[in-house]
Amino acid sequence: GKVVSVEVRDDFAQRARRNVVRAGLSPYWDLRVGDVKGIELGMAVDAVALDMPDPWQALDNVDRFLRPGGHFAGFVPNANQVEGLVCGLRDRGYLEVVALENIQRSMEVHPGGVRPSYENLAHTGYLVFARRPSRD
């Protein structure tokens, strides 16, 4: 198998290429520079992972290359984006649509006790998972 990456920015694509080469994974990786909203992959893929501000706008094109029964994952940083993505997936008939919040917060650890830090410096992000139906 191979991982196909689509990066809209050439500078990010070059950074990704350096990281993949450094990790020794080049034989298993294919880089495309372009916009996932309209790029032609020329192949069907088993899974898609998107990290972009408006992933719901890419779903029409994702449907062209994500095989039936394939898995979808998306990362978005705010709740309004979760709504757009989840609604977009449901509108297309995707199954098992799940949205999860990932919260990172510091813990106070002392002998005899562990509790969350009272400082409210937390970072959150949302992961959305779904499966394309086996038949459209």
Which residues make up each language-model segment?
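S-adenosyl-L-methionine
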Residues: 4-55
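C-terminal lobe and adjacent flexible extensions of AdoMet/dcAdoMet transferase-like proteins
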Residues: 130-136
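Short, glycine/serine-rich, charged loops/turns that create anion-binding
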Residues: 10, 79, 134
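Short, solvent-exposed coil/turn elements at secondary-structure transition points
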Residues: 35-37, 102-105, 133
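Short beta-strand element of Class I
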Residues: 1-4, 72
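C-terminal substrate-binding/active-site "lid" region of AdoMet-derived donor-dependent transferases
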Residues: 56-126
